[in-house]
Amino acid sequence: MSIPSLDYRLFSHGDPAQRQQFCEDLVKTFAGYGFAKLRNHGLSDERVDEAFSYSNKFFNLPLHIKQKAKHPEAPNPHRGYSGVGQEKISAITGFEKGERSEVRAAELRESWDQGPADDELYANRWMPDEDLPGYRSFMESFFVECQTLHQSLLQCIATGLSLPSDELSSRCAKCSAELRLNHYPATPASSLASGACRISPHSDFGTITLLFQDSVGGLQVEDQQNPGVFLPVEPDDVHEMIINVGDCLSRWTDGRLRSVNHRVVSPTRLPGDADVMIPERHSLAYFGKPSRDEVVDSLPLFVPEGCKPKFADRWTALEYNQSKLMRTYNVETAAQG
């Protein structure tokens, strides 16, 4: 399986026919693969390089500095620095299928999370600016750039589905998205030999995820023709964006667009020697999400006449998000906010 690569410039600078074709191709790719590669997405190479530079600087800070903006042990607020092993994505493997394993595998990853600068429910957690000058200013502006692209892609999907262009983007008008920096420290291959992953198989919570990964590799996506088989998504270019469908968008479309399991393991090109050191890996992920009070059931317009909706439990986006966060941070209850 090879993830299709789409040229966003056909939409942003194309004629009406090219714009329509891009929208239809995006829908077709998301329906078949759940993932796509996106080039000419509008975030400049310089901005992406600067984001990776800040990620590297942040994670190289002494632990006591990073912990000035420490993520709480509880799920909320989902903000700030999480140390290696604090968040356990293995706890939500199979969540959408109703499979709730109690096995919480070791995951070799630390991360940083932030939300909108004006979020009244969950404030961001920042270190003093002198600890990493320019970090907060850059991250806040990069967040806005990602949000703008996210909304545009939702409009593309709606257009590709022959819906009003704001049918989906309007449901995300009050931003509750998150921007995450991930760092996977260098580790011996033997540390992944017993079933541990850099990040366990999971699907994303929200609408569309925008991802940049460095050149190390290790991202794998479940083959939709062969469930349980994971295939590598090798980075062609660190400036290329990988986008994928999240659970809420899949639910809205009654499963027409696929929210697909993915994971991060040892890069396939490395030898199988247990003594080999797997190099450190960085990724940047923007998790688009619905407005918190939006219901994330199947939308009636996607349910065939005479059929029952696949998703009809009346969860709001916030409730759905919390139901997964409570498991990843090993907490059984959390404030709904």
Curated annotation (Swiss-Prot):
Its cofactor is Fe(2+). Gene3D superfamilies: B-lactam Antibiotic, Isopenicillin N Synthase, Chain. 2-oxoglutarate binds at residue 281. One of its GO terms (biological process) is small molecule biosynthetic process. GO terms for molecular function: dioxygenase activity; metal ion binding. Fe cation binds at residues 202, 204, 262. InterPro entries: DIOX_N, IPNS-like_FE2OG_OXY, IPNS-like_sf, Iron_ascorbate_oxido_reductase, Oxoglu/Fe-dep_dioxygenase_dom. FR901469 inhibits the activity of 1,3-beta-glucan synthase from Candida albicans and Aspergillus fumigatus. With minimal inhibitory concentrations (MICs) against Candida albicans and Aspergillus fumigatus of 0.63 ug/ml and 0.16 ug/ml, repectively, FR901469 displays greater inhibitory activity than other 1,3-beta-glucan synthase inhibitors such as, WF11899A, echinocandin B, aculeacin A, and papulacandin B. This is 2-oxoglutarate-dependent dioxygenase frbA. It comes from Dothideomycetidae sp. (strain 11243) (Fungal sp. (strain No.11243)). The gene is frbA.
